[in-house]
Amino acid sequence: MKKTSRRTFVAGASAAALLTGKSVAFAQKKYDNGASDTEIKIGHTNPYSGPASSYGVIGKTIQAYWKSVNEAGGVNGRKINFISLDDGYNPSKTVECVRQLVEQDKVLCTFNTLGTPCNTAIHKYMNAKKVPMLFVATGASKWGKPKEFPWTMGFQPDYHTEAVIYAKHLLANVKDAKIGVLMQNDDYGKDYWEGFKEGLGKEANRVVKHVTYEPTDPTVDSQVIQLKDSGANVFFNISIPKFAAQSMRKAAELAWKPVIYLNNVSSSVASAMKPAGLENVQGVITAQYLMDPTDKQWDSNNDMKTWVAWMKKYNAGASLEDASNVFAYAVSSLMHETLKKCGDNLTHENVMKQAANFQKFRLPMVLPGITVSTSPTDYYPIQAVQLSRFKGETWELFGDIMAAEST
């Protein structure tokens, strides 16, 4: 068979286009704001300061990721201009930052903006502007509703489903459960809470005490005292790392030893477990979907070896024990793949189209057996987790991979 050279093929296609009067789609370059022949602008907000500042490492690691991509030639020949702003975990500040990113910096999309309350504040704005709001750093179930909000997509397993899994596990494994709940008083906390109640079903009356805190509170000591005094023998901890560490440390000070279920967003050894005191967190249960860098079983895994080498080269000084650095690397890899799939069609519409077109994609640092799948009607990229129990200085996975369609 005669081998067709690229030059011959393109010339032939051009001739065909002249005959038919149609343009050659694959030869066209299409750009919206934030994209050009040389650059792709991506916007980001992160709490580099404030009560959730432990998540600041996510933004720093994402910056390092794009630096490494640019050093390797960029994405399809275009350098990434990553603009990351500090919103302090303050929704009103997030609005200010995102307006700047969209209206002044004119980014192609925002990526991994962090926090349920912060993303809630910009949700309607981004969809009204029809600017992609991709792979947000929050598991609220509202990020997976393409009919109502076609320009917003989540990333991690949604909080509602995660909470259902905790509830079902405790009902099956804790005898005579009396449950105390600590919850951040916003949409993030409420999403977990609603899922937890759904999972408990007819056993919802096992919740004997439910207390809340505000992200601006200095401590949650008084709330933990109330939970202990309720007689609860199970503690469902719906809090960000600062308060997760405080609450588990306070429980130990009070000699309160419930079975603790800790939301995934506060499972980092570096930012939550060590600050709480390792002796105070033995046996804590969480759900995971990413490889934990402190788990020795992954030491010989190719993904882990690649990540460690990358961290040492591009993110030197950052903790190899902080799961947030794994999260940032994994979600950046998904954004990277999305942009690669866009080719030269870097429009808002095509970015969303490609983000919604993954089928069982194997993402680096995700647990074996868990993949990324999306479609125009499914905006939940990852919908599976595995339970894990803290032992010694690390998490130990147990049981099977559990998947559930979000409700």
Describe these PLM feature segments.
Residues 29-30, 54-60, 72-145, 155, ...:
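Beta-alpha junction/loop-to-helix N-cap segments that form part of ligand/metal-binding clefts
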Residues 8-27:
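N-terminal export signals
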Residues 251-329, 401-405:
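Extracellular/periplasmic periplasmic-binding protein-like sensory domains
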Residues 32-36, 43-63, 85-91, 114-115, ...:
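Extracytoplasmic "Venus flytrap"
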Residues 27-42, 75-79, 171-176:
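Immediate post-signal peptide segment of exported/extracytoplasmic ligand-binding proteins
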Residues 87, 134, 141-144, 215-216, ...:
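Venus flytrap/periplasmic-binding-protein-like
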Residues 93-96, 103, 141-144, 150-255, ...:
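Extracellular/periplasmic Venus flytrap/periplasmic-binding protein
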Residues 313, 317-325, 336-395:
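Segments of small-molecule ligand-sensing domains
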